[in-house]
Amino acid sequence: RQSNLCLEIALPTKPLSNVEDDEGEIALCTLSAFNLGAINELDDLAELSELVVRALDALLDYQDYPLPAARKSTMNRRTLGVGVINYAYYLAKNGVKYSDGSANGLTHRTFEAIQYHLLKASVDLAKEQGRCPSFHETNYAKGLLPIDTYKKDIDLVCEAVSYTHLTLPTT
């Protein structure tokens, strides 16, 4: 079973038999965001990623956990969530629009840079402190990155959104 309170991503969970059950898992994700409006160069993301990964990781060790299952899941998985704010301003400041497709290239480059720098910061931290205990359960342990799990069918949906109806292939 998988869930996340904000429902933006799916995180592993295991059922609890009671609130003190330490065999269950409650998914928690410690969050932060890059203020894209303050980013001038994509290279700025390298240092910022290092800082945010280390800060959030340190927070995992000293925050309070109301239930053993929440602590267990967090300590074993060390899940971090890093998003963005000020996206619309970032696009405007760079002279592109979301509505006409001119932002597609910048958006792709920006989020590719964010993903790269966050992964690099996480790898650097793992080299220093070791992998999280549940690393072997992840796609990363299999050598898969998020881009490797991309479903091409989504392209059909994105290309067809201007139609009044849509039928996806059944094969």
Q: Regions from the language model: what does each represent?
A:
Residues 119, 123-163:
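Short glycine-cluster motifs
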